[in-house]
Design a protein with these regions (language model features):
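Conserved small/polar residues in nucleotide/adenosyl-binding loops
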Residues: 243-249
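Conserved S-adenosyl-L-methionine
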Residues: 234-240
């Protein structure tokens, strides 16, 4: 179901109580569509911790899947070990080998992808990097990222492929082998790409090439923090700054 940015703004303004109800409704809808053959993507971070708690309130048998890249903070790994029914995955290749072959992820996945494509002469990514991309109204696109043009001359390879091989590839393989469909804790407010994904597919992307549920997409970070404070559920302290939590007392 396609939405608008205005729809997202309205939903982001809902009360936390309403957001909880709608998110759990979306989780149940996803669970029933695939006869329970689903899983939550669990990193040990605050967003996926809230997602797992919401999901297991309505569907207690949902497994969580954690990709152990070897790069996480020990505190996060220790926290993941406290949860029941968690499936641990590992990437096929070590981090150093992936960096050597594909390059470093710089600033963000989105920026790394633009730099990599621009270096290959791809017109769309060059336009974004030069600040020349226009939207459908002929105005300067919000997807321009000319502030990072200097990275074109960086003396090392830059790529977003690192994230794919370290996290996405193990999850994709698990999906194919298990037949389960993912529920993720991403928030639309975290990036333009995630916002566009929600606008195009909504919370439950049944029609995606890779079906994906993102029932927290319309939440804000302050909602996540309020939920942790309100419920008192355990979380990894390293994933939440002391300043942020005090602000929501």
């Amino acid at each position: 179901m396609k939405h608008t940015r205005q729809d997202l703004n309205i939903m982001q303004g809902w009360s936390l109580e309403k957001k909880i109800k709608v998110s759990q409704m979306k989780i149940l809808e996803w669970y029933r569509e695939y006869n329970g053959q689903v899983f939550t993507s669990f990193s040990g971070g605050k967003d996926s911790t809230v997602l797992l708690d919401l999901a297991r309130q309505v569907c207690p048998d949902i497994p969580a899947v954690y990709v152990d890249t070897g790069l996480e903070y020990p505190e996060l790994r220790d926290f993941v070990k406290t949860k029941d029914n968690v499936i641990w995955l590992r990437p096929r290749y070590p981090f150093t080998q992936i960096l050597e072959k594909y390059g470093y992820p710089i600033i963000s996945k989105e920026v790394s992808d633009v730099i990599n494509g621009a270096r290959k002469g791809q017109p769309y990514r060059l336009a974004r990097l030069n600040g020349e991309l226009l939207d459908k109204n002929g105005k300067k696109s919000i997807y321009n990222c000319e502030n990072y043009k200097y990275l074109l001359d960086a003396p090392f390879k830059i790529s977003a492929r690192c994230c794919y091989h370290m996290k996405k590839a193990p999850l994709n393989k698990f999906e194919r082998q298990s037949g389960r469909h993912p529920i993720t804790g991403v928030l639309a407010c975290e990036s333009k790409l995630r916002e566009q994904s929600w606008i195009k597919f909504g919370c439950n992307g049944f029609e995606c090439q890779r079906p994906l549920s993102q029932p927290l997409a319309f939440w804000l970070e302050e909602d996540i923090l309020r939920y942790l404070k309100m419920t008192g559920i355990p979380y990894a302290p390293i994933s939440v700054s002391y300043t942020h939590l005090r602000a929501h007392e």
